[in-house]
């Protein structure tokens, strides 16, 4: 009887270990590369599979955190304009930028602001949060 319980416990333990290992592997995401130069400009990407819209905001000359009333740059998940695969939840944009230092964030569904988890540097945003930093050479 004790041997039977020990075998049953071992099988149950092994099953739980296998299931928990398999489940945790589903949460590991492929790390995206930080913004980098491509022929047309700087390539930005952000992983947001459940988003309906993702925008790029920053102190770029053409939007300056909306200081001039312009719109944020619209990122795509449609397989066009720098986006590689439509519908994969990876939003992308290629933005022409001159050499300089830029601070930026991603705006998801118009109201949630996020730093770039792949950025090489962040800085205090002056409001208790952080901005991602990009240096274009």
At which residue positions do the language-model features occur?
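Bacterial N-terminal signal peptides that target proteins for export
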Residues: 2-11
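Bacterial N-terminal signal peptides
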Residues: 10-20
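N-terminal edge beta-strand
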Residues: 26-40
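Structural beta-strand segments of beta-rich domains
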Residues: 38-44, 52
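Aromatic-rich carbohydrate-binding modules that target alpha-glucans
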Residues: 49-99, 109-136
């Amino acid at each position: 009887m004790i041997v039977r319980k020990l075998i049953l416990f071992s099988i149950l333990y092994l099953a739980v270990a296998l299931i928990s290992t398999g489940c945790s592997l589903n949460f590991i995401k492929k790390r995206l590369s930080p913004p980098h130069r491509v022929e047309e400009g700087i390539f930005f990407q952000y992983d947001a599979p459940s988003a309906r819209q993702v925008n790029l905001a920053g102190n770029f000359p053409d939007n300056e955190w909306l200081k001039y009333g312009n719109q944020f740059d619209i990122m795509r998940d449609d397989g066009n304009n720098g986006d590689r695969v439509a519908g994969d939840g990876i939003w992308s944009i290629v933005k022409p930028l001159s050499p300089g230092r830029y601070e930026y964030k991603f705006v998801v569904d118009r109201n949630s602001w996020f730093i770039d988890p792949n950025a090489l540097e962040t800085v205090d945003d002056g409001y208790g949060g952080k901005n991602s930093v990009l240096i274009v050479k």
